[in-house]
UniProtKB/Swiss-Prot annotation:
It comes from Streptomyces avermitilis (strain ATCC 31267 / DSM 46492 / JCM 5070 / NBRC 14893 / NCIMB 12804 / NRRL 8165 / MA-4680). Binds 1 Fe(2+) ion. This is Peptide deformylase 1. Its EC number is 3.5.1.88. NCBIfam families: pept_deformyl, PRK00150.1-3.
Amino acid sequence: MAQQDTDQQHTGVLPVDDDGFVIDAEDCEEREAAYRERGTSRPITVVGNPVLHKECKDVTDFGAELEQLVADMFASQRTAEGVGLAANQIGVDLKVFVYDCQDDEGTRHVGVVCNPKLVDLPADRRRLDDSNEGCLSVPTAYAPLARPDYAEVTGQDEKGNPIKVRGTGYFARCLQHETDHLYGYLYIDRLSKRERKDALRQMAENEPRYPVVAND
C-alpha cells in the first residue's frame, strides 16, 4: 500500500492506498484517543427529533468549530459504546460522521467523513447481508436489515480534502447507516411496517444505557 507523496500530505490527513482509498486501519487507538480526549460527550438525539428526519446541511467551513465537533462526536460515540455516529445524532445539522468499527476480518477502522455520498456499485458487487442492525438513536432496538456487504463512500476529511473510504461486512453496514443518517433516514425507515413497529416497541420497553435528548 502506498502513502501519499509528501507534498500531497496535509496535517491530520490519512494516507491512501494504491486505489486511492484512505488507510484508516493504522494507529487506531492513538488516533481515536487524540480525537476523543479533546471532546466533550453530548447526549444522543432519538427517533422523533426533527434533526434526524431531514437532510443535513453540507459542511463548508473546515475550521476550528468543525474540529471541536468531531472531537465531541468521538467522545459521545465512546460514551454510548457505538461504532459510528452522525452529527445530527448529537443535534448538529451538518453532514459529518465519525466511525470506529471493525470489518468482516476483525480489522478496526477509525475515521471522519464530511459530505458523504455512497458510491452506486454494480449488481455483481451487491451481495446482501441481512444481519441485525441497531442505532444509538433507536436505543435498545435491533432488527435484521439487508444491506450490501461492501460499500464505498466519497466525501471530504475534516480538513476539506477529498477522500474515499471502503468497507466490508459490519464496517460496510456502518458506512451505509451513517450516510443514511445525514440524508434524514434511520435504519427503521427501511424496515417493513411490522418490523418498524417491533423496533419501536423494543425501544419503549427498555432504558437506554447512555444519556439521550428527550423529545418534546
